[in-house]
Curated annotation (Swiss-Prot):
The keyword Cell inner membrane does not apply. The gene is psmA. It comes from Pyrococcus abyssi (strain GE5 / Orsay). GO terms for molecular function: threonine-type endopeptidase activity. This is Proteasome subunit alpha. The 20S proteasome core is composed of 14 alpha and 14 beta subunits that assemble into four stacked heptameric rings, resulting in a barrel-shaped structure. The two inner rings, each composed of seven catalytic beta subunits, are sandwiched by two outer rings, each composed of seven alpha subunits. The catalytic chamber with the active sites is on the inside of the barrel. Has a gated structure, the ends of the cylinder being occluded by the N-termini of the alpha-subunits. Is capped at one or both ends by the proteasome regulatory ATPase, PAN.
Length: 260
């Protein structure tokens, strides 16, 4: 008789809790996000920034066709990590909800309303049979009265952040944000910080495999940065990265000298 792991029964159905209170399928959906490309968001006094790593696996792929930051409305954007097809379904739903709100109330939808709608859908996919949890997390950013930034989890939970990262480089990026984030940052400083965090999680950062978008307080309009703009910011960031690496090496050598 084949050995059956004790958690097997709870693995097969998303609606059944394990004895220790876990939903295994939700945990597996989170694992899909953890294996995904890194996406970061940074809020500042002038607006909000989203930046993502584009994992282009072949030189034959057109980089412009590989989209990881999506416009939801004029004033709302989303960045994804995890299963891209799942993220696309969530993005399309967010776009629909934003347009329904405009038609119903004659005003732009508050970001918090759209986030709640998306997370309600995610939560439903953890509770009913015949479906599975979405294997994607979204960072949702926007400007209504002020800049806002949310992280949405596969479980349906959501949190507001000043700076946040999802995907495989989350831990590294979050450590950088903890160290370098300031509430009074300008938009340019926020862009640099977002690209800096991404660059530290990537082997070969370049303008081709980084995508950046901003929404400013001034015009409340979504805009993607051009390749030339990203190259400019990345050049400045890489100088900072190199300077930090030199300082770290100097500290390592000074510690070594102290042992003699």
């Amino acid at each position: 008789m084949a050995f059956v792991p004790p958690q097997a029964g709870y693995d097969r159905a998303i609606t059944v809790f394990s004895p220790d209170g876990r939903l295994f399928q939700v945990n597996y959906a989170r694992e899909a996000v953890k294996r995904g490309a890194t996406a970061v968001g940074v809020k500042c006094k002038d607006g909000v920034v989203l930046a993502v790593e584009k994992r282009i696996t072949s030189r034959l792929i057109e980089p412009e066709s590989y989209e990881k930051i999506f416009q939801i409305d004029d004033h709302i954007a989303a960045a994804s990590s995890g299963i891209i097809a799942d993220a696309r379904v969530l993005v399309n739903r967010a776009r629909l909800e934003a347009q329904i709100h405009r038609l119903t109330y004659g005003e732009p939808a508050p970001l918090a309303v759209i986030v709640k709608k998306i997370c309600d859908l995610k939560q439903m996919h953890t509770q009913y049979g015949g479906v599975r949890p979405f294997g994607a997390a979204l960072l949702m950013a926007g400007v209504n009265d002020k800049p806002e930034l949310y992280e949405t989890d596969p479980s349906g939970a959501y949190f507001a952040w000043k700076a946040v990262a999802i995907g495989s480089g989350r831990n590294t990026a979050m450590a950088i944000f903890e160290d370098k984030y300031r509430d009074d940052m300008t938009l340019d400083e926020a862009i640099k910080l977002a690209i800096f965090a991404l660059a530290k999680t990537m082997e070969k950062p370049s303008a081709e495999n980084i995508e950046v978008a901003v929404i400013t307080v001034k015009d409340k309009k979504f805009r993607k940065l051009s390749k030339e703009e990203i190259e400019k910011f990345l050049g400045e960031v890489m100088k900072e990265v190199e300077e930090e690496e030199v300082k770290e090496k100097e500290e390592d050598y000074s510690e070594l000298d102290s042992h003699y």
